[in-house]
Amino acid sequence: MLIIKRSVAIIAILFSPLSTASNLTSQLHNFFSAQLAGVSDEVRVSIRTAPNLLPPCEQPLLSMSNNSRLWGNVNVLARCGNDKRYLQVNVQATGNYVVAAMPIARGGKLEAGNVKLKRGRLDTLPPRTVLDINQLVDAISLRDLSPDQPIQLTQFRQAWRVKAGQRVNVIASGDGFSANAEGQALNNAAVAQNARVRMVSGQVVSGVVDADGNILINL
């Protein structure tokens, strides 16, 4: 009987880390599936941390910093009460991303006819690849793009709504009042970007460009 008890204990010791790793992998899969909802519908997770360094509890609290990447090799904080451990995790995510549908020259406008969505592994893409095709509305390419090339945020800009030297309408508003005046834009700016304007008096003011090309200043 003693031999049997010892055998059971040894088996429990040998296989408990495997069971813990399996449960933790499932928890991590659920964690990243929730984080990537709407972006990826196919997530695979593998733990790279050694089994003896895994959290000691069955249901650790998992978290990541707000600016962390959600795929590739990442670090996840696992808490068991006061015990904190960082897990090295590899996340593979599959979903849609935006590519050039045809050759696009630098300075060309990105529109429905020359960009498209493609499905593939998001974790293997260049940094800051565009996932939402709506981000390219009224965008201008900053470099030549080849067919099927993933489009990155650094490769385009929004079309200028206001250009340097243009006469613009400045609208200053505050609590219960609003005033309009004209001035000259000192820089190029897209919608929702800041533009500096020299007023007739010579004073330089700064405001946000709206969809109509007005410069809005909140006082």
Curated annotation (Swiss-Prot):
Q: What subcellular compartments does it reside in?
A: Periplasm
Q: Does the keyword Mitochondrion apply?
A: no
SMART domains in UniProt = SAF (SM00858)
Membership in a protein family: Belongs to the FlgA family.
Alphabetically list the UniProt keywords.
Bacterial flagellum biogenesis, Periplasm, Signal
**What's this chain's function?**
Involved in the assembly process of the P-ring formation. It may associate with FlgF on the rod constituting a structure essential for the P-ring assembly or may act as a modulator protein for the P-ring assembly.
Give the matching PANTHER family: FLAGELLA BASAL BODY P-RING FORMATION PROTEIN FLGA
Which range is the signal sequence, renumbered to this chain? 1-21
Protein name as it appears in the record: Flagella basal body P-ring formation protein FlgA
Q: In terms of one coarse class, where is the protein primarily found? A: periplasm
Please name the InterPro entries in this protein's record: Flag_basal_body_FlgA_C, Flagellar_FlgA, SAF
This protein's record includes keyword Nuclease: no
Source organism of this protein record: Escherichia coli (strain K12)
GO cellular component: a single term: periplasmic space
GO biological process: one example: bacterial-type flagellum assembly
